[in-house]
Amino acid sequence: MKIAKRIVAIIGIVSVLAFAALLVNYICGERMIDRYNKRIYESSTVNAYLGFTQPYIYHYNKGDIYYSQGDYKGAENEFKNALKWEPGVPQDCEMRINYALSIVKQIDPQTVTKDNLDETIDRLEEAKAALLKNGCAHDEDENGHNSDAQTLKDEIDK
């Protein structure tokens, strides 16, 4: 009988801790979205620690903030950090699209010369490679499992 009570107590404690972790993640996400909608584009490092069950979200949100501010290099770095956490589908493709866009936005077609053409092509190939990874887009056909990633890859090919 004592063992059954202990098991029930342990299950109860684990359930409360799991609920608390999910609640903290939810509150941090809602707070970030609320501030973003109010055009308060800043991030709290507290969210990085409190969002421990989905650590990629902090970097993804921070990348969105940088992108909104026109800091495409900062956005690129944050999306790259988010991808290191290997989020599942569909987040993976969404992050790859944003990562690729942050690279493309750093390229000004008016400033491309013979001297920097190879570097520009390398950057576009980097963006394209990100879209092709994990099948978000396909190189030889239109069968990538994310239509936005496929469209962006096709635009880069042009």
What residues fall within each predicted segment?
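Alpha-helical protein-protein interaction scaffolds
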Residues: 28-155
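Hydrophobic membrane-insertion alpha-helices, especially the h-region
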Residues: 5-24
